[in-house]
Every structure is written in structure tokens, then in C-alpha cells.
Amino acid sequence: MNNNTTAPTYTLRGLQLIGWRDMQHALDYLFADGQLKQGTLVAINAEKILTIEDNAEVRELINAAEFKYADGISVVRSVRKKYPQAQVSRVAGADLWEELMARAGKEGTPVFLVGGKPEVLAQTEAKLRNQWNVNIVGSQDGYFKPEQRQALFERIHASGAQIVTVAMGSPKQEIFMRDCRLVHPDALYMGVGGTYDVFTGHVKRAPKIWQTLGLEWLYRLLSQPSRIKRQLRLLRYLRWHYTGNL
């Protein structure tokens, strides 16, 4: 068997993270032996680890997800520090989503999109069809009422979607995916946060050089100074990192 279809796991603060070497490894793992895996993909960064530490409900949600992977460079560095032999790299959630969509388009895999503003969702659908001929079997923007959730779950199930991506922010998207899987378990679910906004150009992502240097967080801070409180929270994570408490 190609060793790209398997991956080691590493533990940080009790979380079991998949160690992908690069994007190709991630894709080969998710499509092992030509069969798309089923379960829930959750991107893990330092901020999410802090949230998990302080919120038992969120911890339970994240722990239940089968595929937790290092989306943040700080998490990758922590894994490498704790496990010096680890061959793990950052796989950005936004990039992984695009690669999954490209693969889905190539193979005709049915996709259901959830979340985002109505106009952003419509633009996302159009771009996915035009760019990769993605077989979108249904969609729902993020503006639905709680009493409409069950009907939406049934609609997703009836669509036969094999990939369901949910852009509602954390922990809303994790709650949605957990509950939807009770009705439609046979799919790969992925929480994608603000990915639709980035994909359609409504939100600008850091230039590649900033991403390569692991400074995407700094670019976002300079672009949105209001994020300073969120960034200051990360000092706690840094303390864990440098004192070996991860």
C-alpha cells in the first residue's frame, strides 16, 4: 500500500492530530484506494486549542471529529517540538477545500454547500462549476432558522452528497455537522469558516510569501487591528509551547 494513504497521529493538549507531510499526502489519505473517506474534517489552530481548553462542549465536539489536522503554523511547530521526528506540515483549510473541490469536479463527486451570505454562496457555486465543473447537488446559505435545521438535514440526505462543506464559523459549524451526520452519515464533512468569502474575493488572504513564512496571522492583524485582543489570547498558547506543556 502507498504510504501516502496512511498517516501518523500526534497529541497536543489531549487532541489527536493527523500528521500530513503536505497537501498531496492529505489528498491521498482522504481518497485512499480511490475511496473517499467518511467523517468530519476539522482544522486546528492555536486559537481553537485555547477554545477547546476552556469550553467542554466544544472539546467534545472536536474530539468526536475523525480528521483533525494542523491548519495553523504554530500548531505545526508545536508538533515538531514535541515530536522531533515528525514529518508534518501545515495544510491550510482554505487550500484543502479548494483541492477537494477540484478533485470532486474531476471525479463527479456530489457536493452540498452550507453557510455564507446568499450572494457569496451563489458566487461560490458559480465559480466552482465554471472552474472545476463541480457537481453541486444542493446548497443553503447560513441564514436559516433553528426550526428549519431538520428539514435541511433531510434535504442533504436526499441529495446523496458525498462531500458537505459548512461555512458557519466555529463552533456552529461543528454542531451542525455533528447533528447532520445523524441523518446523513455517509459523507465527508468539512468545516470551512470564511473560506467561501476568500474564494470569491470578498476577503483578501495574505500573500503567498507571508503564508510561506508563517506570518499569515501578522498580515491579518495588520489588516484588521481589531484582532489584537484575539492575538493577545495566544500568549497563553505560547507559554504552553515554550514550557513543554502541550
Curated annotation (Swiss-Prot):
GO biological process assignments: enterobacterial common antigen biosynthetic process
Superkingdom of the source species: Bacteria
Pfam families the record matches: Glyco_tran_WecG
Membrane found in the keyword field: no
Keyword NAD on entry: no
Matching HAMAP family: WecG_RffM
Name of the protein in its database record: UDP-N-acetyl-D-mannosaminuronic acid transferase
UniProt source species: Escherichia coli O127:H6 (strain E2348/69 / EPEC)
Gene that encodes the chain: wecG
